[in-house]
Amino acid sequence: DIKVWNLSLGSALEIQNNFISPEAALLDEIQFEYDVLFIVAGTNKRISDKDGMKIGAPADSINSLVVNAVDKNNKPATYSREGNVLSFFNKPDISYYGGDKKDKMRVCMPNGEYFVSGTSFAAPWITRKAAYLIHKIGLSREVAKALIIDSAISWVKPNISSNLIGYGVVPRRIENVLNTTDDEIKFVLSGESLMYDTYNYNLPVPIVDEKHPYIAKATLCYFPKCSRNQGVDYTNTELDIYFGRLNGKKIVTVNDNKQNDNVALPEKEARGMYRKWDNIKSIVEYVKTNGRAKKAYENGLWGFSLKTKERLNNGDGKNLRFGIVVTLKEIKGVNRISDFISQCSMRGWLVNRIDIKTMIDIYNIAEEDIDFE
């Protein structure tokens, strides 16, 4: 089955402020119903167009992975159009190299070599990476999407608007999407939201001198059912993520998420701070020069909790699949991955390393034709 589809096309007109385009709504419906992923170009601005021009349909598709373009210096291309969508959803999602000005992209045309630029040429590179992760490495589309977005998120606070580059620029090499540096622990969690609270409180993170010397990053992706006739209240299901150290039965969240603490929290703040009703959620602690280790509680366990909330019909979020990518960065640069794997195994986790060469060998052997004489 073909699970990854590239759409290098788009409208010259801007998206509307208060409702999703029919084309984008159809893409969102298809991705909710079927196990597929659309990669959509972020559309281009012409020289004659105004500054700050919004993206065009179908780049307002919430479930799709929307790609804008940057130049070779990771700066937004001069033809970039801007998000966000419905004044809230972060679009584009990511950026990649699409050529610009004198540094155009070299392609093969029917008449030979040609030099081009545009988001239509950036998107296929991301499509290739997504297809590689899903078809060759064997990851789910939720995890694949989360990995690609997570790889674009820097430990340093960005100085370019997310309306132009999304969560960041995806690395050129697929190894840098899957692999980590020696001072990082990266793991993926996937599953389905079977009830109101889907959780695990049994993540053993290595302790050093009764502290956790890490900063953390987590990226959540899922594909909710959407309702175009709801206007700005477009997504039907919210997965509210809580991730951090476990103190008794309570998670001390990395991003201080208080949505479940019975405190007064306006909807605008919940959306802005915790991305409520967004199908992509990123939690990140940026590197600080005076960063300190965190206190370790009890057995040094961390946990996560996903609370499922419905806007319209009970059941829209039932069996909704999700993918979470978690990265822990050691603040002193020490490699603690072996200790982490050992502790996970002792607690009953089945830890499978993602080895690119091994997965490719398995894929190639599975694709071989066998002749029975």
Describe the function of each predicted region.
Residues D1-A57, V116-S117, F121-A122:
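Substrate-binding/access-modulating region of protease and related hydrolase catalytic domains
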Residues S11, G42-R46, V70-K72, D100, ...:
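Acidic, glycine-rich active-site loops and adjacent beta-strand->loop/helix elements
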Residues E33-D35, S61-S64, V85-K91, K136-L147:
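Subtilisin-like serine protease catalytic core
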Residues M53-A131:
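Extracellular S/T/G-rich loop segment that most often corresponds to the catalytic His/Ser-adjacent loop
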Residues I137-I215:
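C-terminal subdomain of the subtilisin-like protease fold in secreted/lumenal serine endopeptidases
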Residues P213-A216, E285-G315:
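Noncatalytic modules at the cell exterior or secretory-pathway interfaces
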Residues P213-T253, E310-E373:
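Exposed low-complexity, polar/acidic, P/S/T/G-rich flexible segments that act as propeptides
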